Amino acid sequence: MSKKVLIYGATGGIGTATAKKLAARGNRLHLVGRHADRLEALASDLNATFSCGDILSEGFIPQTVRDAGECIDGLVYAIGSITLKGLSRLTHADFIRDYEVNAVSAALAIQAALPALKKSPHAAVVLFSSIAASQGFGMHASIAMAKGALSSLTLSLAAELAPTIRVNAIAPSLTQTPLSQSLWQNETMAQSIAGLHPISRLGSSEDMAGLAAFLLSDEATWITGQIMGVDGGRSTLRVKG
Ligand SMILES: NC(=O)c1ccc[n+]([C@@H]2O[C@H](COP(=O)([O-])OP(=O)(O)OC[C@H]3O[C@@H](n4cnc5c(N)ncnc54)[C@H](OP(=O)(O)O)[C@@H]3O)[C@@H](O)[C@H]2O)c1
């Protein structure tokens, strides 16, 4: 059945791949992004509507929900930031910005969309956490904290909104998108990080989009409150002893 899906971060790597997959399956999309030219081009390709702005701008989140329409079946929050610094270099502003962009704005987006999500017979929300929320990585203190909060938000809202709205999160390991480019643009470094995964490669946006589309679909109507690793086995397996 065709669903109306609101996608935040639609011009990002994972957001775009998710939008393309959902559109190919006949869903109707409302896209949210910061860059008018890229957003307009994607919306035109996918026959979607869109809202352009910064998620932290006053009044922008309620505006995106008004623009999306009265009934929303799916919400994807694929906005994210990454601040990789040692603790002594992290500023108060770094912590607050990562927390607001990754966690608080996700909560506010779901809050604003609640009346529209409640009008859907099978509403579902997909958030993006990170492997760094459950595994300790150096230089990740700020983003790990923010994604840890997002994982907890997933559980809390899944409980609060059941059985009307399902809430799940995907926790990627290193995925080749613009966000993480500094970690994979050097071939030697990319291969070395790929080798840390039991399935020895880096993630792709399509790996994430496949699970996001499944979690939004009617094939997943008994799945809620889950934080699912898409990480080549890195968070759970030790294959080399
Ligand atoms: N890539 C990875 O290795 C990785 C690992 C773990 C978790 N994740 C999570 O996966 C999700 C998708 O990220 P991605 O890898 O696809 O990264 P991406 O390509 O950089 O996409 C992130 C999107 O967030 C948008 N964004 C950032 N700050 C914003 C703001 N203040 N207002 C509005 N939009 C904003 C960016 O907009 P612009 O296009 O305008 O910059 C971009 O579209 C994020 O939640 C990220 O934290 C990614």
Where are the regions that the model predicts?
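C-terminal helical subdomain
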Residues: A169, T188-E219, I223, V230-G232
